Amino acid sequence: MPQISRFFGIVIYMYAKDHFPPHFHAMYGEEEAMIDIKSKQIINGQLSKRALKLVKEWAKLHEDELLYNFKEAQKPIPDFKLIDPLD
């Protein structure tokens, strides 16, 4: 599970050859959620309101990069790119 970003204690990562729809995973402490890249909604899991707000804000800024990484995740040897954290 390559880490692609980290900010305010939130870790963002993707799995290679993960299933559709395009999504990423966010972990904050003991909480973990799978987030749809397009809608920015939780598909599975949970995050606190504060963490989810930060994740959605970050995902809006980096949607193209997230989609690139998800496309890479489908390849036999993915080339994940690190994405800048939320400032």
Regions found by a protein language model. Name each.
Residues 56-87:
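C-terminal structural segments of small proteins and small subunits
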Residues 1-22:
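Short, charged/polar N-terminal "headpieces" of proteins
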